[in-house]
Amino acid sequence: MSDKTKGIIAATAAGAAVATAALTVPPVIMQRVACARGREFKLSDAFKSKDRKSKRSMLEVKRKVREIKQREYESVEIESYDGLKLKGKYFANPQKAKRLIICFHGYCSSDYHDFSYSFDYWFERGFDILLVTQRAHGESEGKYITFGIKERFDCKSWVEYAVKRFKKNVEILLEGVSMGATTVLMASSLKLPKNVKAIVADCGFISPFEILKHVMKKSYKLPAFPYLYLTSAASGLLAGFGFKDASTVDAVKRTDIPIFFAHGSSDGFVPCRMSIDAFDACASDKKLFIAGGADHALSYVVQKSDYERTLGEFLSKYIKNFKI
């Protein structure tokens, strides 16, 4: 082999190495940014929006958070299927109606923020309330957020904990907001106890791949290929899950649990069509509520009366003596 040939081969190899590094390093960074435990959502973040309706809605949420934080609760804990300690807050209802709602918050959000506004609605209807802190958030253990992929199994574990603690005659609802909605929808196809009577899914996305593809295109003008595919591969190596490992659309095709879908028509983070697609695919009894003009996770606040009425009419078919 001539020195010239060796030089060409060496240069080609060096070029390939640089190209590989250029394609590999950014996806690893992107995976860590998207999935690693990080900064928790703060209410002040919401006020960066220029939309007045959203700001007014967030002021109401902020007020409700202050109220709910004054209530007494029991700290509870379970162990996930992969050995993580997961935390929750259990609020016992004096009505003792044998009803429990288990609530799952969204991406980098918190239990108080996502469920403060609906807390009184459930409490007045006799529900004990279990606010779950999702893995890789708050006091719960976990290095990586998995956008519902692993959280769906955590959901199943929380249901099994509830049935064991509150006995077999307890009626259970599952509620999720944003990534929490994706969590409960993905869990809907698992073998859950019959105690789960219905699911409330507010502004969930279809899968990690679909929501990250949307964010990359909208915010960074980047195509899914090759970056998102490489980032998914990096996630498989670093966090043990790929962005296409599960989807809400696939899950609800195989569920028999009644599902109430809600979404704001003006959602600036998760496109409303993602709930519509999941609703269309759902094999069980279902209802879709679109809140006109509502931004992300604000459907309940923006159209409270219509939301509660539509939700109540749906749930009254599955929960005994449910107050509409």
Regions found by a protein language model. Give the residues of each.
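An N-terminal hydrophobic leader/cap segment in hydrolases
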Residues: A13-E79
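Conserved alpha/beta-hydrolase
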Residues: Y121-E141
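Alpha/beta-hydrolase active-site loop
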Residues: I145-F166
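Hydrolase active-site cap/lid region
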Residues: M186-G242, D250
